[in-house]
């Protein structure tokens, strides 16, 4: 109810199990926002299935390195209509609501948002091939892991200088170019709003500005400073 367009439920780093995820997805829908679930990886078929069956509007697949991995992850998100994917059909399930099996499954392939996380040097290297995979809807830049993968945080740059390094700028530019050529949306993680305008101007329109712990800590520190 705070006005965010979308919220991410993190099953990669967060201590999450299906019952908790289900409750969070219900709360997000009730608040009027859209939901995206980050799963463990492209081969987390069960995690992708559970998230979509429980009503996730989108799936974020981390640690993509190759077009083959991208295609495998996409396949798990889509029902096999027209051989589009390999998602299992089950009835009834929460995500169907009142639509019924055909009402939900028949249109879900067009409605689910499939996002791949760009966070490795190999992903940047293979970006053209990854962007050519059908039904990659969104490419989500993960700067932390990408900097580590590129060797930028191993004594080369101090934190947070790695975020403005020429190497990361070049990788980001390649991501933007390849995604734009294929009409793929761009997203990214940010902690705070200092650089949001900069990345909006670069074409990123799907931006996270923090997680729950970040929000709690930021507001807690602000209250403390206001009282001393």
Model-found features: residue ranges?
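Expand to "…catalyze enediolate/carbanion chemistry for C-C bond making/breaking, isomerization
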Residues: 1-228
